[in-house]
Amino acid sequence: MNKSHKIKKPIKVKFVFCLLIGFLIGNSFTNLLLQDDRGEIHITIVYSSEKASWMTTAYTDFIDTWNDAHPDEKISIDMHPYGSSDSMIGILNEEISPTIWSPASSIWLPFLNTKWKDLTNNAELIINLSAAVKIIYSPIVIATWEAFNDTHNIKGFSDLHKLNLDSGINIKMAHTDPRLSNSGFMSVIMALSAASGTPSENLTMNDLTDKTNQKWLKEFESSAIMYGKSTGFLARYMKSEGPDKLNIAFLYENLIRDISSSSNGGKVIAIYPEEGTLYSDHPFCILNADWVSPEQRKVAEAFLDFLKEPTTVETALQYGFRPIDPSIPLDPEVFNYEKNGIAYNLNIPELKTPNDVNVLLKISDLWLLSKAS
């Protein structure tokens, strides 16, 4: 008994000693990891999905540039493509907390500011509109098949409306759900402007409630076969399914470049509405939110400065985007009607966002009254 007891005691002491050493080593290692994690500056960028290819390229190039210039400052960036409306709702619901928010269009910025103020009762706006960085844009266009347009000579919204009234023409149209996606939202604004004959920036609530306008829109929407969540999906659907399934879609110009020459059933072309078009100007906004630290803002500002570099902008042009800076020339091999179905010059009016925020808030309600069942 005594012998056995004497043997167990040093084992117990050794065990406790080893446990203590293990704890100290493990705790030190954990602290080292935590210190390393605290030393890394992490930002999150939420952006509209149609610019994913460009953003992926820009992200890779920026990380390389940052590491070369700041070898002792570690950063990490999470990149998340979202629908513009979806991301706005996610911010308001605190589901996402981006450092940089880049919806497809500036049309969403006053939206978020208004809803943020109502939700938080905070006098400070979450977006400083004057500080939004705009680098590229893409107009909303009417996508159709070249052969289809050779027959029907579509020039804009009014022509499409007339075709919808002709029972002998089988129009199969699509745009995205304006409650979820920027392109559908902007398309409904453009259609209302055409219906009322009112410049889009001057649209009022009277234009939305006008029975004649509502009738026109109902006729216009009558040929819709789907309302997608993603503009990119509509482009891919048009490309893969051909003109028998979808012969009219409202897309971004840059997506026409992606699908024009490789689509089943012929060539897809962009029609630039004679009434004018809204531009998706892809603003980049560093949010004024409590989750954005000064260190994160510093990295975010560096990223936006990098995006503004001419070489970075020129990369975006290869994906079919146009530069905000007029001194940066277009590539005629990209903006080439014969090759990619898109024009080099834009010879149509640029429409503006409605000045009345209430109009913006009610556009989706108007669509719900008018949409095809």
Question: Can you annotate each of these PLM segments?
Answer:
Residues 124-130, 134-142, 211-224, 228, ...:
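Periplasmic-binding protein-like
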Residues 14-30:
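Hydrophobic membrane-insertion alpha-helices, especially the h-region
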Residues 193-272:
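Ligand-binding pocket segment of bilobal, Venus flytrap-like solute-binding proteins
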Residues 2-17, 38, 289-373:
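Extracellular/periplasmic juxtamembrane helices and adjacent flexible linkers that interface
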Residues 52-59, 63, 85-88, 106-109, ...:
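Extracytoplasmic/secreted envelope proteins and their assembly/folding machinery
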Residues 6-16, 34-180:
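N-terminal segment of the mature folded domain
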Residues 52-56, 179-197, 202-206, 210:
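Bilobed "Venus flytrap"/periplasmic-binding protein-like clamshell domains
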Residues 147-155, 180, 193-202, 290-299:
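Short helix-loop capping/hinge motifs at secondary-structure junctions, enriched
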